Amino acid sequence: MDSKNQIQKREIKFRGKAKDDGTWVHGDLTTGDTIHISASWYKDGECEWWGHECHEETIGQYTGMKDKNGKDIYEGDVLRYETDYDLLYFEVKWNKDTLMWEAISQVIVDEPLYYKNGFIKIIGNIHDNPELIERIAE
């Protein structure tokens, strides 16, 4: 088997809140004196580009996973995990020690996000919905 077919690729993308109008933008992360989310593409043989300066604290990376409704899960999202016997809320964080995306709550700490993948729903994020952080602490 061809080795390039054995490698599973994950889409690398980011989101952040634009400083100019407060909207969420998605694309590539570029850093320097300021932080931008940007995208580029070719049209009619010319390279076109857009970029938005973003609030640094709102930058979050795509986890490569989707919730039960098919929505992309990003760092900083707040998830609801519901089964017949559980109702829990989690914040999505990157653990640099285990090199894994984790669902963090007060009840279950440091559990790999993929353990709950089929039962989770995005209900907001820590930036637009700070009141959801209280649910995580319950």
Residue ranges and their predicted role:
Residues 1-138:
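Secondary-structure transition motif
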